[in-house]
């Protein structure tokens, strides 16, 4: 199966408000539709999640730039997360945290992204 990056906009109640996908496993290019959805859903929006189907289990430099722009545009912090084969990482108070229990939408996000969960061993 082909892998692809997928983005989810998650509401305050944990429901998926909107989704977008690319045809590339390493990149989800900016899109006008996504930015319009973010702006239209800004009152309900609590989290922006996306997949890294080929890794890494963490935020890329492009992710960092996007997170900064979103926080600035909305005037408030959001929760950001990355779902990869090895788990889910969220940004909490400026720190990256590997979740021990993933949200309900993590597994469907993996499936749509063309990846399987492959837990990593921690030292």
Residue map of PLM features:
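Conserved beta-strand-loop surface patch within small alpha/beta domains used
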Residues: 1-45, 53-123
């Amino acid at each position: 199966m082909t892998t692809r990056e997928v983005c989810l906009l998650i509401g305050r109640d944990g429901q998926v408000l909107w989704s977008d996908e690319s045809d590339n496993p390493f990149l989800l290019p900016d899109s006008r539709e996504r930015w319009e959805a973010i702006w239209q859903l800004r009152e309900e929006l609590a989290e922006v999640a996306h997949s890294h189907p080929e890794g890494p289990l963490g935020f890329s430099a492009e992710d960092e730039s996007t997170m900064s722009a979103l926080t600035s545009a909305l005037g408030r912090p959001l929760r950001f997360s990355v779902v990869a084969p090895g788990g889910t990482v969220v940004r909490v108070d400026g720190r990256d945290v590997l979740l021990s229990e993933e949200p309900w939408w993590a597994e469907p996000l993996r499936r749509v992204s063309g990846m399987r969960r492959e837990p990593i061993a921690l030292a």
